[in-house]
């Protein structure tokens, strides 16, 4: 493939592109309305808003409607925020009434400004953004209802969230466990617990979770620049995530749970030891004795197959971990890298385990129809042939054209912009590679000529 004539320089937007040596000029005045292109042998490159619609409507595959899912994904509710204004008391009664009227009118105006949708006229479609519950004060069970209305969203929030929402959920989890009637867990006893201070910049992971036989366990505290440090205690494994959503669920006692687990472990160990003793006795009775030529007896010892015991800390998530992760899933299914690191250090898990748990939950919800992944330009059910044809004539889009393509493909503005950016990067790479090949060929030819002259 010959790339000699494909030398594109996309840093400068005034490119010369044509079919066979033609050129298309782009001026700043025609950037918003029309494009004018002139070429000796190239086709006409004038494209307006009407021509874009003709290109889109020309392809039958492009007009095919996207397949609707069985059940649409749940979206977050619109949380209305209201502002309150304080008024100062005056001596006369008339002035106080005026101040009250002014304050009420100001509060109405402020609330109307906050609640008015579509404030930004440039954005045509509103996206579901994961709202962090850091603004709420958790003081009673009624406040927990504000967290139960969160649904699953397919949008990755670009906003920088405060990691304090992780501690809010775990504190709510611990408080509900301490308020449950069937509970013998004392969250205030931290005598036998190790509380580790974790910074967001540290890479050390800890595993504070103890064995099931212990009555208490700890969850480490966070000291980050954006959140205040708070010591957190892990609840008992009898607590269920259903208590967070205010459903009555009967829970078992932690002491009974530990006693049952200890009895089961003791019974299993006794059976295992008895089986080993019986096997050893049988093997000793069935020892084979062989005699050598000298008359010496050689005892052939049997090989005893003993199961290897598990060593190290358990990598499986405990019941507390699953319940806390279930509460974190309700807030966001796309945690940032900083949030994933904090969660892994709090729960004593690795970074990859937390990341894979969120990925598996997204896959599970998508199979059940409760969650749908964000649409990509390549798999949105519409072909990209009109975009490719438009890219051959013009490598850059105006804001108006980008919005029209985004509305036609039902994708975001940034996806169309990134699509053209990626196409330009590919052409840049091909042109640079072609130039490098040409330089290598020229160097080889010069070397051959020099060798022939010397010969």
Curated annotation (Swiss-Prot):
The keyword tRNA-binding does not apply. Residues 446-455 have a biased composition (Acidic residues). Gene3D superfamilies: Homeodomain-like. Pfam families: Homeodomain. Residues 1-53, 67-121, 178-239, 258-296, 431-455 are annotated as: Disordered. SMART domains: HOX. InterPro entries: Distal-less_Homeobox_TF (IPR050460), HD (IPR001356), Homeodomain-like_sf (IPR009057). Residues 310-369, 372-431 bind DNA. It is found in: Nucleus. Putative transcription factor. This is Homeobox protein 14. The gene is hbx14.
């Amino acid at each position: 493939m010959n790339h000699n004539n494909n030398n594109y320089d996309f840093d400068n937007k005034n490119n010369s592109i044509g079919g066979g040596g033609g050129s298309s000029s782009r001026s700043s005045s025609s950037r918003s309305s029309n494009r004018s292109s002139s070429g000796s042998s190239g086709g006409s490159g004038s494209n307006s808003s009407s021509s874009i619609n003709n290109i889109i409507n020309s392809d039958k595959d492009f007009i095919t409607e996207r397949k609707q899912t069985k059940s649409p994904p749940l979206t977050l509710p619109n949380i209305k925020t209201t502002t309150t204004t304080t008024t100062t008391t005056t001596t006369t009664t008339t002035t106080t009434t005026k101040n009250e009227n002014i304050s009420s009118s100001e509060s109405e105006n402020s609330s109307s400004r906050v609640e008015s949708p579509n404030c930004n006229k440039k954005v045509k479609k509103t996206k579901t953004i994961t709202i962090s519950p850091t603004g709420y004060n958790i003081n009673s069970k009624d406040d927990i209802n504000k967290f139960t209305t969160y649904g699953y969203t397919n949008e990755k929030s670009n906003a920088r969230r405060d990691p304090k929402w992780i501690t809010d959920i775990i504190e709510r989890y611990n408080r509900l466990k301490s308020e449950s009637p069937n509970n013998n867990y004392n969250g205030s006893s931290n005598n036998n617990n190790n509380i580790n201070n974790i910074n967001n910049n540290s890479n050390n992971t800890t595993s504070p979770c103890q064995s099931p036989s212990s009555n208490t366990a700890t969850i480490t505290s966070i000291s980050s620049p954006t959140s205040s440090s708070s010591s957190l205690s892990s609840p008992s494994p009898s607590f269920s995530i259903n208590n967070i959503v205010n459903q009555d669920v009967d829970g078992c006692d932690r002491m009974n749970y530990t006693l049952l687990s200890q009895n089961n472990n003791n019974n299993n160990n006794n059976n295992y030891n008895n089986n080993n003793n019986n096997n050893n006795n049988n093997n000793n009775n069935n020892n084979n004795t062989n005699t050598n030529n000298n008359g010496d007896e050689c005892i052939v010892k049997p090989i005893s197959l003993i199961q290897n015991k598990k060593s190290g800390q358990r990598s499986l998530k405990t019941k507390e971990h699953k319940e806390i992760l279930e509460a974190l899933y309700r807030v966001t299914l796309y945690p940032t890298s900083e949030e994933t690191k904090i969660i892994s250090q709090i729960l004593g898990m690795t970074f990859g385990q937390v990341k894979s748990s969120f990925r598996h939950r997204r896959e599970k919800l998508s199979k059940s129809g409760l969650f749908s992944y964000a649409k990509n330009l390549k798999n949105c059910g519409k072909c990209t042939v009109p975009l490719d044809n438009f890219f051959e004539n013009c490598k850059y889009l105006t804001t108006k054209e980008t919005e029209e393509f985004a509305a036609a493909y039902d994708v975001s503005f940034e996806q169309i912009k990134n699509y053209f950016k990626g196409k330009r990067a590919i052409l840049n790479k091909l042109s640079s590679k072609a130039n490098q090949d040409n330089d290598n060929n020229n160097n080889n030819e010069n070397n051959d000529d020099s060798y022939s002259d010397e010969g």
